[in-house]
């Protein structure tokens, strides 16, 4: 059964690969389903020599593409941070009163864990005291929204500094590194001891090196921006406040591995992130910093966005690849790993948002500074999200190896209520008794 499924998946991948990344099959399925006048799905299937059942199977997999979801007008966040805060039932009642009982649904974690009361309406996210202005929101009026608090407590900031906050800085750094030997870039990442920030902890330099040596007539770079864990909004911070850092990391990866195309898979629950990245990409293209023959070199690299449609599993790299290809987002058997057989069965690097931003920070600030923080297995700095139960909620850049007691009591300012335990690492993480913070540090081990 597994062999048959892998064989069928490979056929779909190859057929989907003929369409290419720019107008990928998942994008076509999503846009068609969400259109006011959808095309007969049989026509799309026929156009690409695919079975209708394949497209129906993919379409039915995603929450946002189901009729039951499309009939709603507003969605209340049901992430664990909002649920634990006890704000959502009253919020749901208010929205039902304004819009109707059958017009309010639920959506999983909108990344507003620092203020709660989160809900989604007409393509935008709202939270905190925004519900008090619901009449203005329904009328389509813009309202002032609170921004999450962010601050670096790191010895050296790699993720929150302003060294790549303008297109001029992007141009200067790109001009420098496109003249640098690719092996030197890989060596910098290896020497830094940077490991993947998405959870697996695989050495980033090693992943880039493996893919650079893989045989293939086409290679891809994917930014995994499907941040689905409740309580996490660090990727959202980087996408919205440090988009050039993330994009620069992708460009450098493309340069090293020999890729001319990349894609950011951003969850649909983050409309502001999609807007910020899209704006940055368009700006860089206008300046000739993305596209054909960048800065007059023979290196070409283009970027696009793929918008997730409500599937938590897409945070797993093989499920994410399946999604872009227009398949059901199901985890594939490994090996082969994406670095040798990834998107459309071509060598592919899949990196998390924070990993790419950290790679940029390392190239700009130096690998020695990064590796000197923390230890060999947990080096550098890490973004930590503290939700609304802390007196100082927000996203912070913190040295690896920092005691959890310091993070909770000094940086977080203690708690607004008496706590027994805390959740770490999202649904797949764990619940840890509060007493254990005396024995824990911020690291991967």
Language model feature labels by segment:
Residues 1-445:
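Feature of Fe-S/electron-transfer and energy-metabolism proteins
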